[in-house]
Amino acid sequence: MTQHVDDPSVQAAMNLRRLQPGDEAVLEAFLASHADSSMFIRANARRAGLSYNAEPYQAVYAARFHGDRMLGVAAHAWTGLVLLQAPEHAAELARTCTEFSRLPVRGLAGPAAQVREARAALKLDDAPTAVEGDEVLFALDLSDLVVPEALTRGAIVCRAPRPEERDTLCAWRIAYDVETLGATDSPESRQRAAGFLDAQIVDGNAWVALHEDAPVSLSAFNATLPDIVQLGGIYTPPALRGRGFARCAVAASLLAARERGASRAVLFTGNPNAVRTYEALGFARVGDYSIVLLR
């Protein structure tokens, strides 16, 4: 007979603790079983480990176990975001990881029901937000990618950004942050946007689409693993939208990921136009995802 976590005998065997170096394998095994909705937390842990020294990509992790089996995890990241993969313990883990970290909470991200539960537990339901709401989680096996005809015949060319394009792409990135993430156009937000873009370029995770030698769209990954990538920061200037440029940019970035060995891609969006773009490339809806960014 299968025992539920509410069973007293199961609860007696459960424990909650902060993750430490040495816990990487059990964390990876758990997150891999929820791969599509765990990209931020999984990629950060792989990149920065489980120590916390306020460095980029680091986080303070709290996890609930039953014996040696992980049941859920929350991570309070260096950015202030609480990242969740806690199907049954989101409230408890959100409270615990923030108590461990003592960092300010600047937002939450994860499966939508978990974010709602954690937000209530942290007493943030009435906090002012820049962004909030449920989005659709999409996934694609890269063997099923539908490549746009304009890309295959060379009408649109995609490649890594060049230094002389940085100013243009930085302007696009801040425009993306304002439009999508509720940012304000300020010197601080421009510096932050440029930093994110520069990191994506250095890591080989940004691609620019060109039409008649002029940049027309940007595709990027905001989390990567050897077998799976997550799209984020896709932007086409308003005057150039509706012409298939984003579709070509995204397809080119996914072809590059496939050549590197990735077999799957995920993303989340609530934008109806973006939904049409991704479905045309072969993406299918696999769940939901939510990001709450506090003001």
Give, region by region, the residue ranges found by the protein language model.
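Acyl-donor-binding surface of acyltransferase catalytic domains
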Residues: 2-5, 66-70, 77-154, 292
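A short beta-loop-alpha structural element at the N-terminal edge
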Residues: 11-29, 111, 157-171
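Conserved donor-binding loop and adjoining core beta-sheet/short helix segment
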Residues: 15-19, 29, 35, 43-107, ...
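A conserved beta-strand-loop-helix scaffold within acyl/acetyltransferase catalytic domains
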Residues: 46, 76-78, 184-234
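Conserved acetyl-CoA-binding loop-helix of GNAT-fold acetyltransferases
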Residues: 89-96, 232-238, 242-259, 276, ...
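Conserved active-site alpha-helix within GNAT-family acetyltransferase domains
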Residues: 113-130, 247, 271-288
